[in-house]
Regions:
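Short hydrophobic interaction/assembly module
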Residues: 28-55
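Hydrophobic alpha-helical transmembrane segments
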Residues: 6-14, 31-42, 69-89, 92, 96-100, ...
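Final/C-terminal transmembrane alpha-helix of multipass membrane proteins
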Residues: 130-147
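Helix-coil boundary and interhelical linker segments in multi-pass alpha-helical membrane proteins
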Residues: 19-34, 75-94, 142-148
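Alpha-helical transmembrane segments of multi-pass membrane proteins
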Residues: 20, 37-46, 70, 79, ...
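Interhelical loop and helix-boundary elements at the membrane-water interface
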Residues: 1-12, 46-74, 103-135
Length: 148
């Protein structure tokens, strides 16, 4: 979060690379990581509230755990849904698509992403807008798998 330009994009990219390493180098089960992300979500609700308590900006750029959580959702669910070996180039293509889509939804904030961003000036709003952006990515991937 201390990177001056586009810290959210850097956090999302770092998350994407980190998850690729966990899933495809260390071969960690995606269910374990998804469960960990859920735990991190609840811990972050508390931790982010403490961090932003005295700040006027309730969604500071220094807080990037929300990008980690939001970017992790589609990647973990992709890995759970595709539990068969795939070629690395195909996996990297989908990871890249998930990264780009997440950034688009996180930046443009279509409803309900914008709803959480505007109406909850607390840790719940900080994190839930990214969770919704991640769920939009999941929805697009599901539609892709159904129709293509």
């Amino acid at each position: 979060g201390k990177i001056k330009k586009v810290p959210g994009s850097f956090a999302s990219l770092a998350t994407t690379l980190f998850l690729f390493f966990l899933f495809h180098i260390l071969n960690i089960f995606p269910n374990i990581i998804l469960f960990s992300v859920i735990i991190i979500f609840f811990i972050s609700l508390y931790a982010v509230d403490i961090f932003i308590k005295d700040l006027t900006n309730k969604d500071p750029k220094e807080v990037v755990i929300d990008e980690f959580i939001g970017q992790s959702i589609p990647i973990c669910l992709y890995e759970i849904a595709h539990n068969i070996p795939k070629e690395t180039d195909q996996i990297l293509k989908f990871y890249f698509i998930m990264f780009i889509l997440f950034r688009i939804f996180d930046i443009t904030k279509p409803y309900p992403v914008s709803y959480y961003d505007k109406n909850f000036k607390n840790s719940f709003g900080v994190i839930m807008d990214d969770v919704c952006a991640g769920l939009y990515v999941v929805a697009i991937l599901v539609l892709y798998m159904i129709f293509i």
